[in-house]
Amino acid sequence: MTSGRAPHATVLLLVGAVVASACGNGSATPIAIESPRQATAAATPSATPPPTPTPTPKPRFWPLTGLSAPADASLTRRPLNVRLPNDPNARPQYGLNKADLVFDLIVEGGVTRFAAIFHSKDADVVGPVRSYRFSDLHITEMLRGGLVSSGSTVQEHDAVTASINAGKMLSVDADRDARPYYRLASRPAPNNLFTGTPADREAVNRAGGGGPVDVPALSFLLPGADPSSGGLAGAVPATKIGVPFLGVWASSFSWDGTAKGYRRSQNGAQTVDGDGSGPILAKNVIVMTTDIFQTAVIEDNLGSKGLDYRMTGGGAASVFRDGLRIDGTWKRDGALDMFKFFDPSGTEILLEPGQSWIHFIYPTWNVTSTP
């Protein structure tokens, strides 16, 4: 049987001594002598490198809601500011539950309208859509957004055009691109113009605004954080809130302890989304005082003059979250900065992740609340 070991080399050496042979022939007989076996060093096993740890993905949050964003979400897509009416025959509005923010703003004659901001979610049906005001210019510039509306006065149109030309915002209002808009036969004009944010985004792309933008962020508690943290100096219980707009535009909010948010009502009726998704739930209700002044622009056929707002600098603010009221201040340094809120100690108030409703009122008005 053949051995599995490698054969060893042999060396033939001639021995100098003459060995007597029984044959007596005197010749030297070569003797085969095996050479010493070479020791083979044992192989040293190579060290196994430790496994490379999988990096933990950095948490991502939507800038206008503070809610977690999936890995493939585009946090830098352009927000949309959709202008919605708030008069009784325009209700219920469609798409409100999909908005990240809703600004409730006084326009001419004490009427209020909504600036509904869509960023983290899209809504297939939004409306009715109405005309914009100077306040929409400030909000849309702040968000680097796209303005969605039915049109405006000549003066407001010119102001928005100047902002577009300066690269501060975009507008896809119906006067500039009618393709995202349609009329509902079931509703009387002018509250029958509707749109959808997917179609609005296509219009934004056509206008050259499909690239990334730096969306300013509100300041939020981290998801799951203790609600008692985040700037609550001087906080008092507040389960009912009254926003002092005039007449049928006055609104109220009631704390829903089960849903952990505020339910909005107007004229005694709960505010619901017309798309059937249910009542509004605001995680934060914010009321800011500022200078609101009349312009020379005629906004309607009654001769009502439009309003404009001071939205930079600062002023008094009341922030409602988690069933509490914090009276403090608001601050906004420049036209591209987001609003910040501070409690009486100077600590920044952090908002609850979710939808926020923001209101501006005159300095002489007061927001009411009950424990």
What function would you assign to each model-found segment?
Residues 1-11:
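Bacterial N-terminal signal peptides that target proteins for export
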Residues 19-22:
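C-terminal motif of bacterial Sec signal peptides marking the signal peptidase cleavage site
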Residues 24-48:
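Short, low-complexity, disordered segments immediately C-terminal to signal peptides
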Residues 31-34, 45-46, 56-101, 108-371:
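A surface/extracellular/periplasmic glyco- and lipid-processing/surface-interacting theme
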Residues 52-54:
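Intrinsic disorder/low-complexity segments enriched in small, polar and charged residues
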